[in-house]
């Protein structure tokens, strides 16, 4: 009888590694499987078509309620690189579909988002809501909106102009464009441990930039000032020039729908105390709910995961994207929509 060959330690170790890799791969697949069905649609926009994704719940029967999403600042495709999928799923648990689109000029969408005003963005949301009301899979009597960051200068106008919204949800919304910019500048310098003379220099530079904006300076004049190194692009300067006077204060008394304001206590972009005070003073009584997320960042993510260059954040984004958000945030979305979106 031939003796059996012994399996060496190297092969055992290799087998263990393969099992672990397979298990990790299966885990990642499961964690990135969301209870929504994504359908690509084109919406007739006010200036150009909107290339959008309609995320429909995979469970239950239609027609569905609908949440229209409004992006924050910066380049954004319909899913915000996948960050919206846990949010879509949270709305799906309440029986609601979600609708979001590539910003103009992103992923082949026509136009250029840097050529837009906040009113232009509000008009896009209105167009999307009107389009959705004619869709057979959408219940035209159950509509809501969700917006993050810069979306806070977009959606209150929509919520004041329309009578067909069941709710509005805002995350990390600011009040005044210029005050928000200064708060963010101070917070970033504080995080860097910058000395006082550096802060003073940056505030003087900012004041000079604001003077140019108030004078309506063209791009060549801005470049000649040499205030920024590197300077903004021509399109970005135009975007700031178009929007730097944004202030939501006058819009808040016109809001006529239940509103959930979500604020992170570690938001370094927005002065959440100012935002909460303005909304409590402005939104009509009985319509506002404020939720402050402990350990929450500007985007309602866990602060420790939402910092530039965070390896833990990247791993969580890939392996467990729902866990990026502060525990309870996604459930709050579901619960608020269930309560007000029936």
Residue ranges: model-predicted function:
Residues 63-72:
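Short beta-strand element of the alpha/beta-hydrolase
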Residues 27-62:
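N-terminal cap/lid segment of alpha/beta-hydrolase-fold proteins
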Residues 88-108:
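Conserved alpha/beta-hydrolase
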Residues 169-251:
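Accessory cap/linker subdomain of secreted extracellular hydrolases
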